Each structure stands twice: as structure tokens, then as C-alpha cells.
Amino acid sequence: MSVDLATVKRVAHLARIAVSEDEANRMVGELNGILGFVEQLSEVNVDGVEAMTSVTPMAMKKRTDEVTDGSKAADIVANAPVTDHNFFLVPKVVE
């Protein structure tokens, strides 16, 4: 896969980024270099390689999953103009 000047300009337009002609030409080379590196990575044989989440072996800290109300409901609605039993009240918008 390769990137051409039209693709760079299209992506810049979609991202709403102003890119000069010189910058766009430079980006063509940079993006093609990145894509070439990604293609090299996809060619590496990783069969038998164990997936890892860190470069150093460590156990993830876990906590028990407990359902709570968070004890913050009153704080959350404290600045709301109108509430009812810790719920925000808003004007009806759909009939």
C-alpha cells in the first residue's frame, strides 16, 4: 500500500488541517515510510510467541468487583437547578 499526493490532500481536508503543497509532498514520503515499516512488521512470523502486556513480567493488581451506588449522587446533583431523588429534572423536549 502506498500514499500519493491526492490521498494526503484528501486526508488533510477530512481532518480540517491546512497543509501547504511542500508539506503535503514531504508527508507523502513520510507516510510511505511508515506504511513500509508496518508492512515489514506484518511479515514477521510470530507463531508460538506468547502475547504479553508488558516488557517485564508482572502480575496485574486486581480488586473485587462490587456494585455500589458510588456514594457521590448528592455531590453530582448538588449544582443542578432542579432535581428529584438524586435525578436531574429537565424540560420535556419530545411530546
Swiss-Prot record:
Kind of enzyme, top EC level? Answer: ligase
Arranged from A to Z, the UniProt key words for this protein are: ATP-binding, Ligase, Nucleotide-binding, Protein biosynthesis
The signal peptide annotation in the UniProt record is: none
Which SUPFAM superfamilies did the record assign?
A: Glu-tRNAGln amidotransferase C subunit
Q: Which reaction does it catalyse?
A: L-glutamyl-tRNA(Gln) + L-glutamine + ATP + H2O = L-glutaminyl-tRNA(Gln) + L-glutamate + ADP + phosphate + H(+); L-aspartyl-tRNA(Asn) + L-glutamine + ATP + H2O = L-asparaginyl-tRNA(Asn) + L-glutamate + ADP + phosphate + 2 H(+)
Record keyword rRNA-binding present: no
Q: Which GO terms describe its biological process?
A: glutaminyl-tRNAGln biosynthesis via transamidation; regulation of translational fidelity; translation
InterPro entries assigned to the protein according to its UniProt record, in alphabetical order: Asp/Glu-ADT_sf_sub_c, GatC
Q: Name one GO molecular function term.
A: glutaminyl-tRNA synthase (glutamine-hydrolyzing) activity
Pfam families, sorted: GatC
By sequence similarity, the record places it as follows: Belongs to the GatC family.
Record function comment: Allows the formation of correctly charged Asn-tRNA(Asn) or Gln-tRNA(Gln) through the transamidation of misacylated Asp-tRNA(Asn) or Glu-tRNA(Gln) in organisms which lack either or both of asparaginyl-tRNA or glutaminyl-tRNA synthetases. The reaction takes place in the presence of glutamine and ATP through an activated phospho-Asp-tRNA(Asn) or phospho-Glu-tRNA(Gln).
Output the HAMAP family linked to this UniProt entry.
Answer: GatC (MF_00122)
Q: How does it assemble?
A: Heterotrimer of A, B and C subunits.
The identity of this protein, by name, is Aspartyl/glutamyl-tRNA(Asn/Gln) amidotransferase subunit C
